C-alpha cells in the first residue's frame, strides 16, 4: 500500500473533504438539450465527476461561437447544480476540441484550449496552463492507499486518421459503412511524444488504483470508427508501458460512442485491463458496433458511469456501474485490487 508521504499533490478544493470513494463520469452531452442526467448524477452523491469529452458540440472555427455554446451548457440549472455540489474534472473530445474527428492539424487548438480552461476553471486551469494540450493527473490519498486520476488528451497531438479502403475482411460482421482503417506501421501517433514521456512519469509514480480517462475507447476491437484500435501500435505501447512501469490498478474510462459498455483486454504478462465506456449524457445512437472484448452492455439509453471503491476492505473492491436516465442500474461489475495488479514476487 502507498503511504501518504510518498506523494503530496492533493487537489486544494478537495482537501479536507470525504476521501474519494465514488467517481461519476460521462460524455456526449449536447448544450441544446435539457440534460436532466446531471440531477441523477448528483442524487448518487459522487465525490468527483469527470467529463470525458464532447461536453458540448462546438464544431466551429469561431471561438465566439464556441464560447456561446459553453455558456449555454453553463446556463443549464442541472449543470449549475452539478457544479455547485460535485467537484469536476474534464478532458475533451473532437466536438469540443473544434471539429468532428479532428486531431493535431486543427488550426485553432490553442484557442480552443483557452476557451475550455476558461469554462471549466480549476483545477484544470492550473494543471494544464504550462504545456501544450490538456493532459493532466491528480492524486488522492485514501486510508493509506493512493488513488491516481489521469486524463489523456487524444486530440492535440493525434495524427490524421487513415480512411478505410477495404483493408479489413468483412466476414458479415460489419453491417455499416466503416470510416477508418488501422495503421499498419508505427510512424503515426495518437498521444504524441511529449505526452508519452509525461505518461511514463505518471505511471512510474506509486498508486494503488489508477483511473485513466480517454475520450475515445481503449479496450474495444477495431470497428471502423474512432478508437485506439486505429493506432494499434499506440495501444500496444500503452500496454507495454504498464508492464514496464509495473503500474498496478489501471482502469480506463471512455466516451465518444453514444452508448455504454465494459470492455476487457487480456494479454500475456498483464492483468486484465477494463475500459468502462459511458457515452450518452444526452446523445444517443441507433446501434452498437461489434466488440468481442465487450463483457457488459451495450446500454443505448442516456446514462452515466459510476466507479465506487470500498477502501475499508483488506483487498479493496472496485464496483463499476452504469446508471440510466431513469435511475435504473444497468451494469454492475466488481473486481478487487488484487485482480488488477502485478503479483508480488
Where are each of the predicted segments found?
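N-terminal export leaders
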Residues: 1-2, 199
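Bacterial N-terminal signal peptides
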Residues: 2-10
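Metal-dependent phosphoester/phosphodiester hydrolase catalytic core
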Residues: 14-345
